[in-house]
Amino acid sequence: MKVTTIIAALLSVAVVDAQNNAQCRKLGLPCHATKTIPYVVKKGDTLTHIAHDIYKRKVGICDLAYTNHIGKNPNLIYAGQTLLIPTDCKTIDDGSCL
């Protein structure tokens, strides 16, 4: 009985994890993030500064660019603009968009 309970618990965790990953992909979140938090851009901010200094390299420059649909110039952001910051990134992308 204990083995069955443990197996059932492990399977339910695997199903929930798969559903979360599918939901994140559906939302278009990079780095296998599970959610986002808002950040209001300040004068002089760049994606590099936000990713490396403010969020201590817990998110990549390109993760920010992809999440916020920033085009060819990943540092083209404006003071007052609200960016979504992916949280709980499993991998960090600092180069694919540059």
Swiss-Prot record:
Subcellular compartments: Secreted; Secreted, Cell wall
Cysteine pairs bridged by disulfides in the record: 31-89, 62-97
Cross-referenced SMART domains: LysM
Major site of localization recorded for this protein: secreted
Signal peptide start and end residues: 1-18
Example of a GO cellular component annotation carried by this entry: extracellular region
Binding-site residues, chitin: 44, 48, 75, 77
UniProt cross-references to CDD domains, sorted A to Z: LysM
Phenotype of the disrupted gene, per the record: Produces no to only a few pycnidia.
Annotated domain remarks: The LysM (lysin motif) domains are small globular domains involved in binding chitin in eukaryotes. Mgx1LysM contains one LysM domain.
The protein's assembly and partners: Forms homodimers in a chitin-independent manner through interactions at the N-termini of Mgx1LysM monomers. Homodimers are further polymerized in a chitin-dependent manner.
Identification of the protein by name: Secreted LysM effector Mgx1LysM
Lineage: Eukaryota, Fungi, Dikarya, Ascomycota, Pezizomycotina
Gene name, Swiss-Prot/TrEMBL: Mgx1LysM
